[in-house]
């Protein structure tokens, strides 16, 4: 795995990733806001409990946002792309824009390789 992480993303894939960062961040924030709405809609909980649940959720999700989106660089791009893919932040068409080599690395990182490496 270390040898994979030492590789930088291809220039063409880096350009695609930079294009998709804003879209993926918007999707992630939409997911988080949806989770907040679900917590708020729970009439069985007190307002204070809802507040505490939302606070914890935002803290946890903020760490995830930082891991996936903060300080994008070519040296961390493969990990960030793997995180985006694992969070379901890219559509199938968006993901297929990346080279087969990059998709193979992401599949390896996520443990989703199939027979034949595809």
Set out the residue ranges of the language-model regions.
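Acidic, Ser/Pro/Thr-rich low-complexity regulatory regions
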Residues: 2-118
